[in-house]
Amino acid sequence: MISKIRIFIAVTIMLSASGCGLIFIGAENVGETIFSSPQKVKSKVKNPIKPEVKLSALWIGHSSVLLQIYDKVLLLDPVFNNVISGVMTRKQTAAFDIDDLPKLDMILVSHAHMDHLSISTLADLEEKFASAKLIFPEGTEEFLPGYDFEFIRLKTGNSFKKNYIGGSEIIDSVKITAVYALHYGGRFGLDSYVWQMPGCTGYIIEYKDITVFYGGDTAYDDKAFKRIGEKFDIDLALIPIGPCRDCEEISNFSHVTSYGALLMFDDLKADNMIPVHYGALTYRRDPDFPLLVLKDLIEKNDNTNSMAGIDRKYSERIKILDEGEQMVFEYIEIKN
């Protein structure tokens, strides 16, 4: 108990100095952080990797996703902590056990904020999968200890001058490309929102005939995501939908909202979308509020399209997963 209180006080002082809204989030969560524990997740997939799968995604919670593309296994922004940054307790435990994962090829980190980069989660993964590659944007290395992972640092593409596309690497036949994200690097509040340190990115993951977009944290941009959608033929887009106070605005500060996520989905021209970055943590209102708004927007859009005779519906292409749920999008075709 004492250690939790000390952590909270230290982080509160730090966030107060930063002048950012995180101090209010911390204050509103302090009671839960000190006096409560997250609920246990209802179900976990015990055998997440299957040889017959071409593309699957398992939503672990918040922004953490386990991807299988053919024989390759990737973790995106893995954060399995119950308490994040000392001031935020998860609603429920991360919907995944490392012991249930038989292999891991790559870990992709979008930026160093504490709800996306967990030092302890990476240490746990390192114990079992030290040969995995750790991929991150330039600037994030400042916050990484000396893991045994092979580090792969990518230049970001967060500007019009860079055509919204950053560096890329081919790793074990998987091409990873950094793409535009309108957010911040840094880790502790002051370095992010005052000094505006670089070090954030989205990703395009290409392997064989499958392409996946992962947005990390980002606000909306009416040119960048159109450009990405023109350049890549995206099968699946993992798009954040929160946090947001007014989720029918396009963006707030440095996060896309539920409405903005639909605009991103349209711009990217992706076949399917999974919404992420909601549900696990409380950001000054109901953590599921972005999802409620998204569902309402989907229903309104589909009703309008039906009246106009348009068959292409969001409800058929946007897959809303429970934490711990895995969706298989395609299976490998077995030829007789």
Which sequence ranges carry the predicted segments?
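Active-site HxH/HxHxD metal-binding segment of metal-dependent hydrolases
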Residues: 95-167, 182-185
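Cap/insert and terminal regions of metallo-dependent hydrolase folds
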Residues: 106, 133-135, 139, 219-322
